[in-house]
Amino acid sequence: MKLVIVSGRSGSGKSVALRVLEDLGYYCVDNLPLPLIGSLLEQLKGSNDLVAISVDVRNLPEQDKVLVKQLASLPEGTELTSFFLNSSDKVLLKRYSETRRLHPLSKSRVSLQEAIKLEGKLLEPLSQQMDHYIDTSNLNIYELSDQVRQILLGSVDKELVINFESFGFKHGMPTEADFMFDVRFLPNPHWEPELRPLTGLDEPVAEFLNRQPLVNKFIWQIENLLETWLPHLERNNRSYLTIAIGCTGGQHRSVYVAEQLAKRFSNGKHKVNARHRELSHAKA
């Protein structure tokens, strides 16, 4: 089992780090009381091999001593990585002023500036227990995400999941699409009596469309467009990219084009899915 502990001052980016861990498949628990670490791992044993918890100043006093005790009693074979995120007082004050969020220690009737300084002192012993110290004062959320991935994976690369979805315009456009292509101008197998009851997944329809130069050219141009811009989309820390392909009914042309694009991109480094909305609805 792999356990990641994320701690740090409020406003330094703990929630960003947890989102990165969640994207990497970790079971994440925010603000877990330290005495519960052992019982959490025991409950998740066998079902989740990747676990991440965040620890902040609200957990309990003398956190460093409790943490040392908990880490000493971790189950055998637990691989531990820990982060402490920090920012300068000036940056934290600016972030809180911009977001207008309440600092965890503001309830003790101290000013925001005093709460920030007090938290830094309270967390100082805990920071000494962490493996990795990240100063986020000059980092944006993407740069912080890259640093966390670099430490955990040895690489900043993030697996992008590409979903190719076929649909029929007469049934409405998919709202989750990042890119949408209209293939209603392509030759339509619907007008071939022997092909009408079939779908774009059937070989006769695939052979018919594969013989059409216009179809092949359009697929190639979509492929070229996506290959050109995928690196830029990945650098923007996307987790999913949905490419919607629409024809009139979502039965022939859009299904075939989505399948062909999925096959071409499945040979690369990305995880690729093909989904056919109207065919799924027909089965249901």
From Swiss-Prot:
GTP binds at D56, V57, R58, N59. The keyword Protein biosynthesis does not apply. It holds the Pfam family PapZ_C. GO terms for molecular function: ATP binding; GTP binding; molecular adaptor activity. Keywords: ATP-binding, GTP-binding, Nucleotide-binding. ATP binds at G8, R9, S10, G11, S12, G13, K14, S15. Coiled coil: none annotated. InterPro entries: P-loop_NTPase, RapZ-like, RapZ-like_N, RapZ_C. Disulfide bonds: none annotated. Displays ATPase and GTPase activities. Belongs to the RapZ-like family. This is Nucleotide-binding protein SO_3964. It comes from Shewanella oneidensis (strain ATCC 700550 / JCM 31522 / CIP 106686 / LMG 19005 / NCIMB 14063 / MR-1).
